[in-house]
Amino acid sequence: MSERYPIIAITGSSGAGTTSVTRTFENIFCREGVKSVVIEGDSFHRYDRAEMKVKMAEAERTGNMNFSHFGAENNLFGDLESLFRSYAESGTGMRRRYLHSTEEAAPFGQQPGTFTAWEPLPADTDLLFYEGLHGGVVTDEVNVAQYPNLLIGVVPVINLEWIQKLWRDKKQRGYSTEAVTDTILRRMPDYVNYICPQFSRTHVNFQRVPCVDTSNPFISREIPAPDESMVVIRFANPKGIDFQYLLSMIHDSFMSRANTIVVPGGKMELAMQLIFTPFVLRMMERRKRAAL
């Protein structure tokens, strides 16, 4: 953990809603004049889309039905740890991009589902911002979680997470319900072993809880609206958190535990702005002092 070269990491499963959290931080950075370098977790997958299909078919032929993007064998955990370590020490490192779509791939003259070449991080950034699956991962070989100054978990209750993944993969990526369901089942062991443990290492967790029936996520026709849910916000260390201020600023919020505040789903972005803007400002103040 470095004061001069701070790191913020957003970690969550596929369909958890990490992208919306990233947009909130982008707004904070823009408003406060913070120059960030963004790292997408997908860029640390070991295989591109075509390679992954081949490797998955090979795994299935050998009886491995749980070959997934969530586990260690299909990700460059060592490279991710090296990036975090290098940035924390000197503000440098190497990154690449994963090109999800034709629109993303066109400027690079590549096919969707491929990686760009590795390149150095831009110089003179104020912080590194990571969004992906493994911002807090720890294994016998690596400890990524030790580097972020602020580690945030985004983890809806499981049925809501599945509804969001089903909706996204069907509407935006053209998959069938059966294909998405197979993916969820295949990933389950790695979800339990690699994704869930990270949320015990985070500094703050955001868990959206629907107030409507999501008993069978595989037949749900739409994602519950923000106003049809509540968000549970848990702080690992509540010291210094002004809960009275948050309660006064966020209508219908309440404390459920000494380190937990619950807010209406439609107020999640406001809550993030109120909670994380002071965090970012303190980071920048410490960064200035560390540079003296």
Curated annotation (Swiss-Prot):
GO terms for biological process: reductive pentose-phosphate cycle. It comes from the Bacteria. Its EC number is 2.7.1.19. It is an enzyme of class 2 (transferase). Pathway: Carbohydrate biosynthesis; Calvin cycle. It catalyses: D-ribulose 5-phosphate + ATP = D-ribulose 1,5-bisphosphate + ADP + H(+). ATP binds at G12, S13, S14, G15, A16, G17, T18, T19, S20. InterPro entries: P-loop_NTPase (IPR027417), PRK (IPR006082), PRK/URK (IPR006083). GO terms for molecular function: ATP binding; phosphoribulokinase activity. Keywords: ATP-binding, Calvin cycle, Kinase, Nucleotide-binding, Plasmid, Transferase. NCBIfam families: PRK15453.1. Homooctamer. Belongs to the phosphoribulokinase family. This is Phosphoribulokinase, plasmid. The lineage of its organism: Bacteria, Pseudomonadati, Pseudomonadota, Betaproteobacteria, Burkholderiales. The gene is cfxP.
